[in-house]
């Protein structure tokens, strides 16, 4: 089944900072989908927006009144329906990339892969879940020539 990836750019800061942001998002999402052949659903919507919009979504749906890098909203399982929606906050993502000393393009692809995995049911609440999800992220990102996003985290552990 072909799954569509619709990308909506609400904050032009994304394309100002990263001219090929839409292509990067599509490649990262598609890499996750390609690694999962048994997906049921028609599509994913990915919104590239600003911190205020993500803060409002986080407050309204998660009761957490702050902006975060990425939010994933899985849809109820339905082979004929959407898999879910993802929203990414430009300011938070750009700040994190700068603080971590990595290109915004790499951080964006990581967060898209992370968000799509959440839509597919992956989580990181428990250590074993986090390890499995991070391993899958590393594998997918390696295929996109994105360095291990957790390398510096592990050095500090």
Curated annotation (Swiss-Prot):
The entry's keywords: Cytoplasm, Endonuclease, Hydrolase, Metal-binding, Nuclease, Ribosome biogenesis, rRNA processing, Zinc
GO BP terms, alphabetized: rRNA processing
CC cofactor: Zn(2+)
GO molecular-function term, one example from the UniProt record: metalloendopeptidase activity
One cellular-component annotation, GO: cytoplasm
Coiled-coil stretches noted in the UniProt entry, renumbered to this chain: none
Annotated positions binding Zn(2+): 114, 118, 124
Localization per record: Cytoplasm
Cofactor notes: Binds 1 zinc ion.
Keyword hit for Transferase: no
Primary location: cytoplasm
EC number: 3.1.-.-
PROSITE patterns: UPF0054 (PS01306)
Taxonomy, superkingdom: Bacteria
NCBIfam families: rRNA maturation RNase YbeY
Family in the record: Belongs to the endoribonuclease YbeY family.
Functional note: Single strand-specific metallo-endoribonuclease involved in late-stage 70S ribosome quality control and in maturation of the 3' terminus of the 16S rRNA.
Name of the protein in its database record: Endoribonuclease YbeY
Organism of derivation: Caulobacter vibrioides (strain NA1000 / CB15N) (Caulobacter crescentus)
Encoding gene, per UniProt annotation: ybeY
């Amino acid at each position: 089944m072909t799954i569509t990836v619709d990308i909506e750019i609400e904050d032009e800061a994304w394309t100002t900072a990263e001219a090929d942001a839409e292509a990067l998002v599509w490649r990262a999402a598609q890499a996750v989908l390609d690694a999962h052949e048994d997906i049921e659903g028609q599509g994913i919507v990915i919104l590239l927006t600003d911190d205020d919009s993500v803060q409002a979504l986080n407050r309204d749906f998660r009761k957490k009144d702050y902006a975060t890098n990425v939010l994933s909203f899985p849809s109820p399982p339905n082979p004929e329906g959407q898999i879910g929606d993802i929203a990414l906050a430009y300011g938070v993502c750009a700040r994190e990339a700068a603080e971590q000393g990595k290109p915004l393009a790499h951080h964006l692809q990581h967060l898209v892969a992370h968000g799509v995995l959440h839509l597919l049911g992956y989580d990181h609440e428990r250590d074993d879940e986090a390890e499995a999800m991070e391993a899958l992220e590393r594998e997918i990102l390696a295929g996109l020539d994105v360095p291990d996003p957790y390398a510096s985290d592990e050095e500090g552990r």
